[in-house]
Amino acid sequence: MSRYRGPRFKKIRRLGALPGLTNKKPRTGSDLRNQSRSGKKSQYRIRLEEKQKLRFHYGLTERQLLKYVRIARKAKGSTGQVLLQLLEMRLDNILFRLGMASTIPAARQLVNHRHILVNGHIVDIPSYRCKPRDIITAKDEQKSRALIQISLDSSPHEELPNHLTLQPFQYKGLVNQIIDSKWVGLKINELLVVEYYSRQT
């Protein structure tokens, strides 16, 4: 299954706010109407919607998300918490959380087009897993810095999660540590996602 490229507002109207996909927000009235039309949801549908929320927020294909779930299952600790940490530490998501890109798809484009350096080296893989002490910078070219400046200027300037530090005038972000689960940028019940996959495999 490929990455979703359809109308973004349609997805947030059904699943709720997905800040990684779009900075638009659903109208509360339309949320209530959708709930009343759908009636009582089955447990399967509830789990499916949480999984879809995770997939669309981080911009993953079904195969990619399943791969992350399998990695999380093999790691120590809560599978759901490890899954969220893996997704949050992706390079495209780190750029988004720093405000260097307005959405995760925009961050992915920056990486694909070789505008981003990690520890002084160009990285063109959006799924690159960042680690503590990584230094993320824009390439020292006018176009690269101009693209990031647009995002920094339009960023809502919310409090940065505690695992990141931004130095905007140097177009630089620092990864201080692995993300703490309370700073995950999406309202999600990750246990329902794990349950969904445990029933599929």
From Swiss-Prot:
One of its GO terms (molecular function) is structural constituent of ribosome. HAMAP family: Ribosomal_uS4_B. CDD domains: S4. Its main location: plastid. The keyword Ribosomal protein applies. Part of the 30S ribosomal subunit. Contacts protein S5. The interaction surface between S4 and S5 is involved in control of translational fidelity. This is Small ribosomal subunit protein uS4c. The lineage of its organism: Eukaryota, Viridiplantae, Streptophyta, Embryophyta, Tracheophyta. Pfam families: Ribosomal_S4 (PF00163), S4 (PF01479). Keywords: Chloroplast, Plastid, Ribonucleoprotein, Ribosomal protein, RNA-binding, rRNA-binding. It is found in: Plastid, Chloroplast. InterPro entries: Ribosomal_uS4, Ribosomal_uS4_bac-type, Ribosomal_uS4_CS, Ribosomal_uS4_N, S4_RNA-bd, S4_RNA-bd_sf.
